[in-house]
Design a protein with these regions (language model features):
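Active-site beta-loop-alpha junctions enriched in small/polar residues
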Residues: 8-12, 28-32, 63-65, 104-106, ...
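Active-site acidic/histidine proton-transfer and metal-coordination neighborhood
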Residues: 70-162, 255-256
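A short acidic, helix-capping loop that chelates divalent metal ions and anchors anionic groups
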Residues: 34-35, 66-72, 106-111, 172-173, ...
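Charged helix-capping and loop-helix junction motifs
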Residues: 40-45, 76-85, 113-123, 175-184, ...
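Histidine-acidic metal/acid-base catalytic patches
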Residues: 2, 16-18, 86, 146, ...
Length: 257
């Protein structure tokens, strides 16, 4: 897992962890679109410049507030396309070759067939002019089952469009077991978000603090996921979870600085 593990900048201890371990970084500074311009952008750029000293590589998390790829309003769809294109440009400037995007599915707003059809169209259009090395990973958030995302991927032809399974979101949003999510989405995964919770709330707890058997989950990912599938630790703290990963052998001694 060493070269595939990233630490999210939402983790309060991400700076300390980068000093102690050889990890990649998932940049969350631009989850808020306002940070892509003005003083927000300047502050984010300063922080990213500092992180480059220790980070092994970068993944960028795209903005997601009020951005819906399957939007019914054409102007809303255009806004999503513009913001994601701006985020992709920032990712490339930062040296990130992978960007995480939210699926944008909202229950009771979009019929699933509509969301499915429009999502295929949107993501194919979005990726049409991107560099060959650039990949997106579409993350489940309010998605209540994995089958729609798998069906979407079966229709998508661009190999640089993959899925991001957020285990914590699947645990607290869906009645489908997380391990079933993994089995269904594994052929299409390019990335994973790992954190735990009580099965009801998106709390981003430490890996062992919640309803998901994280050891069983990680062991199964190693068995069925592609070897280039990256993983981001997305807990609020971070330190305790990385120490657990090291103690369990998911991180080798070579990953310690």
């Amino acid at each position: 897992m060493d070269k595939r593990l990233y630490i999210a900048t939402i983790c309060s201890s991400h700076r300390e962890l980068l000093r102690r371990y050889k990890l990649g970084v998932e940049l969350d500074q631009f989850c808020m679109a306002a940070n892509m311009t003005g003083e927000g952008r300047a502050a984010a750029d300063r922080e990213i410049s500092e992180l480059k000293e220790h980070a092994q590589s970068f993944i960028l998390h795209a903005p997601f507030n009020e951005l819906f790829p399957a939007a019914i309003d054409p102007d809303a769809r255009a806004l999503a396309m513009r913001r994601f294109n701006e985020a992709a440009q920032i990712a490339i400037e930062c040296g990130a070759d992978k960007m995480v995007v939210h699926s944008g599915y909202v229950p009771f707003v979009y019929f699933k067939e509509w969301h499915l059809d429009r999502s295929v169209e949107f993501w194919e259009e979005f990726m049409a002019d991107k560099p060959e090395y650039f990949m997106i990973a579409i993350e489940n958030v309010l998605d209540d089952e994995p089958y729609m995302m798998a069906e979407m991927m079966s229709r998508i032809t661009n190999p640089n469009i993959r899925l991001c399974l957020d285990a914590g979101h699947a645990l607290c949003v869906s009645k489908v077991p997380v391990m079933e999510w993994l089995e269904v989405t594994a052929p299409y995964l390019g990335h994973l978000h790992i954190h735990n919770n009580d099965g009801q709330n998106d709390e981003h707890r430490d890996l062992t603090d919640g309803q998901l058997d994280m050891e069983a989950f990680l062991d199964r990912t190693a068995e069925i996921c592609r070897q280039d599938t990256t993983i981001t630790l997305e807990t609020r703290g971070g330190l305790k979870s990385v120490e657990w990963l090291a103690a369990k052998g998911y991180l080798s001694p070579e990953s310690i600085r």
